[in-house]
Amino acid sequence: MICKNCGTEFEGNYCNQCGQKATVGRLTWKSVGDNLLHGIFHVDNTFVKTTRMLIVHPDRLLSDYFEGRRKGYMAPIPLLAVWCVILLFFGHIKGLPGSISTLETSAMHNWIVEHYTLLTIATVPFMVLAVKIAFRKAGSARYNWVEYLLGCCYLSVLYILLSLVLIPVGWVLDASYYQAYQWGSMVLSLIPTYWAAYSLFPDKFWITLRRTLWAVVLYLLFFTVIGGALIYPFVD
């Protein structure tokens, strides 16, 4: 077979000289869309596949990634970064007048929003430490720090997906329900947390739930004390 890109003769699915695919079809709307996504975000069908697997089978995704079966999956940090950008885009949309989305926010909140991607990635170690402590009796030592860091990056994507579901509610819900909206969001965030915890450390429901709640408390403590102390000097 002759490569259409460099003219090298080769066998297989890819040219061993320039990496061009063996089968290059005509340009279509689908191919243009795929190239556009890949060019702007460096995202292709692995983005959709990884996100879907993260929602439906997080245990299989983490198992595959940790055991080296990574072909076809998008790496956790780029996946998290892309979803952060998507969340920021929708988070800046204002809804109906008087809705939660139109409320004035504090300087601390504004700073967090402006640096959301960096902050999300930077707080992953707090999540890792909380999980290692809360699930130590469930065998948390079986995974190393790097595996936990990348696994928690995937978990952070689940939180972002939940936020994307809740944002439209803030566009229409009256601002007087802000506290209820916040508490509801916190309670719902336990669902992906428990789902991920059970995927890594399967056990009885109440045992996993208790450890999950303990991990959440530890994470909030670490984030408030350590994260708050580091962030405060940068807030105007």
Segments predicted by a language model, with ranges:
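Membrane-proximal intrinsically disordered regions of secretory-pathway and membrane-system proteins
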Residues: M1-D236
